[in-house]
Amino acid sequence: MEMDKRMKSLAMTAFFGELSTLDIMALIMSIFKRHPNNTIFSVDKDGQFMIDFEYDNYKASQYLDLTLTPISGDECKTHASSIAEQLACVDIIKEDISEYIKTTPRLKRFIKKYRNRSDTRISRDTEKLKIALAKGIDYEYIKDAC
């Protein structure tokens, strides 16, 4: 399965800055009924720990345009509490995905927009994003415009 362009467009426009890789994993499970093939412990450019989820041809972080660096076994000790916290969240999500989505307002909003927004509107938002990024316009402004 390839990365879903509609989902990427919504994540980068209307939901920019609101979603995490855990949210993307939950959305993929809910919308596409797919579980990740692999879990990757990573850090972002600021050194913040994040779990990334690998699927067939893409990672959850790609939906958010995040560049994550996998951490080594030795570095896992440094991030042990964050790893435990996020793995607990993963277990909660996997245990009852429907309930998790229902109790998370931004994910409910995302799914509603994903299902109800026309392909034309999403394509238009994606086009706005490309033009704005080419001109160096901030994501926050793009989010407000979409």
From Swiss-Prot:
Effect of R109E: Loss of viral membrane assembly
Induction line: Expressed in the late phase of the viral replicative cycle.
Regions crossing the membrane: 10-32
Annotated membrane topology: Single-pass membrane protein
Keyword annotations from UniProtKB, A to Z: Host cytoplasm, Host membrane, Late protein, Membrane, Transmembrane, Transmembrane helix
InterPro entries given in the database record: Poxvirus_H7
GO-annotated cellular components: host cell cytoplasm; host cell membrane; membrane
Cell compartment(s), UniProt: Host membrane; Host cytoplasm
Homology family: Belongs to the orthopoxvirus OPG112 family.
Descriptive protein name: Late protein OPG112
Native source organism of the sequence: Vaccinia virus (strain Western Reserve) (VACV)
